Amino acid sequence: MVVPELQAANFGGDYDNFTYPRYALDFALVRVYEHGKPIQSPYNLKWKTKGSVPREPVFVAGFPGSTNRLNTYSQFVFNRDIFYPFMLRRINSMLMTARRYSERGPEQSRRALDDILNDENAKKSLIGEYKGLMDKTIETKCRQNENELRQRIASDPELAGLHGNAWETIDRVVQKQAVIFKEYTATFSTPLADIAFSIIRYALEKESISPTSAGTDKSADKKTPEKPLAADKTVKKELLEELRAQSLSPTAIALDYEEVRLAGELEFLLSELSAGDPFVRSMLGEGSILRAPADVARDAIRGTHLTDIAFRKTLLDGGRKAIERSTDPMIVFMRKLVPLWLEREEYHRNNIQAPLAVALEKIALARFAVYGKSAYPDANFSLRLSVGTVQGYSMNGTLAPSQTTLYGLFDRALSFATSDVASDFILPARLAANREAPQRDRIPLATPVNFVTTCDIVGGNSGSPLINRNLEFVGLVFDGNIESLSGRFVYNEEAGRTLCVHPTFIIEALRKLYNAGNTADELEGIKSIPLAPETKPSDSKPSEKNLDKVPEKRSGTVDEAKPPRNMVRAP
């Protein structure tokens, strides 16, 4: 229904991302239809335009993605010394590739914008989390918590017999994980590479269900993997549907950008792995020499027909035999790599993930036996309710207020107007024009824009409603401040804050910027939901595309449900 323009939702760009004070109109409204009519549900939150007041108790209801607060100390060290440094190098490489491509011209800049916003967001998030790992106070707390639990278990013979060896198991597995980490993460992702992988995987899984339906060409490439990844038939059927949908997705693909991205991915992996690594040899090897990543990417992209959905369908319908006989350069290229991917994933699943899961379950059971419900579990995308208060905090030797206003937004725009980064702080066009409107149609400069609470959130909470004790909607969660990023490992109530869009700003924008007064009336309960749509949902095309800051999507906290492209979350 309503989506603000990018400059309104992303005001301040990467400079203001994960910061506060903040001035973002970051929201989206959609209407849910049932049987062709707007759904009329009795289950809803009453909208409170005035929002909340300082020190008022508030609650965030949402699905936080994941945290690592209950990790063992050896896992903490692995993340600090291996995982995060590697992922930061990787995101820097991805960001550099996208930026270089965007400098080629306006159209290239447009194509790369989503990836740049995504990667900038991911990088800033990773840096904030990494700083938490480097914080000696957090490290000490992690070690102390583990020692206390182990002592409590050791003092109970029954618990010690059931769970006492779990830490030693994790220590051994993490040491093994550190050795193979780079090899396991030797993957890459581009639109065409993903399509090729899905097509090849589809053929393998389909044949594993009906061995006689595809057949194999004995003279074909013997490197096509024999083992499918999924074992359960029900899982396989669901996987087949997903792989086929991914393979036939009508995604727009710019071949020149695809080539640059693939070359960048291969270049990074070459820099991280040894020249003799089997994956590197399969990617770049030609006899006894290694080809340049740019040359390999060029040959794989420029002759491919995978941009043609009909061609993809032919490969899917042809099964494994069609894959093995295909001369399409991208299929040939990926056909060499899929066996190694599946082999390494199987090894990791059996030798890292499985023993870790068993040992961590033992520790979780022991923790519950010792602490009961007083120690809540790590975030895992399940529904959680976080309580806090609307409250400012100390920062940079001064105080951050609990809320910002439109005065501050205009001041920030004017303050950067003549700087080198002015483009990130340009006033959104509609908001600038609103200052010239008749007085009654202007948004008052004292209008609250964003505000902060002490609620405990992590990636995945973006878009969660903020409610008060009366179950009234008083804000929309869209980000956390930079101090909150260490919350992946420990909650920081002193300075970690949840950032929310104020409901007053949303209502004022609907009425005075977007000509959506009827929608504002619905939210405020002034009028009821229409019984029939004014226009079909699929017919509406926003005049301006709202590109969220991160993958694939949002502004603010990294969305765990859809992590940044080709990123792996901390183990």
Stretch-by-stretch model annotation:
Residues M1-P571:
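Terminal presequence/propeptide segments associated with secretion/organelle targeting
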